[in-house]
Regions:
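Cytosolic nucleotide-utilizing catalytic cores of signal-transduction proteins
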Residues: 3-164
């Protein structure tokens, strides 16, 4: 609670939004430069994938850090394999909300339906619609990961000014 209060106070008083990042802890002076570069990367990755986070740790960036280091050409090739013609924009807002909520609830259909205030069958219908569009069954872990990474890759490319 104290951290939240301090952040809100800082944002209100200074009228700016502050973000901070840190790299790995180092023991020797010669490693400070590396830790600084990690913190800088954490800020870059955070701008793309973790917009809501105000404090970013390099070692907690997860898959976002990996995607950030991939060449754009490889990302484009991946999107072309996952989505027809690489077009990840074929999904409506409702479908994307469904997918993100489904992922947030660890692929649990019942809990996702409850959170979205829809009937379980409505959720299954939406997931089937996505399966028809992509060939990916998001109820299957491997397909869900592929789709999640594809959405992150699309977000990364968009942040770099590359629209597919």
């Amino acid at each position: 609670l104290g951290d939240v209060y301090k952040r809100q106070t800082l944002n209100m008083e200074a009228m700016v939004s502050v973000r901070a990042a840190y790299g790995t802890i180092v023991e020797e002076l010669k490693d400070v430069s590396r830790s600084y570069k990690e913190a800088d990367m954490a800020l870059e990755v955070g701008r793309v994938f973790y917009v809501e986070k105000k404090i970013l740790a390099y070692n907690e960036l997860g898959i976002g850090r990996l995607i950030h280091q991939l060449p754009a050409s490889l990302c484009e090739m991946f999107l072309n394999e996952v989505f027809e013609d690489g077009k990840a924009d074929i999904f409506e807002e409702e479908e994307l909300t469904t997918v993100y909520t489904f992922f947030d609830n660890n692929l649990n259909i019942s809990e996702t339906a409850r959170r979205l205030y829809v009937h379980r069958n409505t959720l299954v219908y939406r997931l089937e619609k996505i399966k028809k569009l992509t060939g990916l069954d998001l109820r299957e872990f491997d397909d869900a990961i592929t789709f999640k990474v594809a959405l992150m890759v699309k977000k990364y490319l968009t942040s770099r000014g590359i629209d597919l």
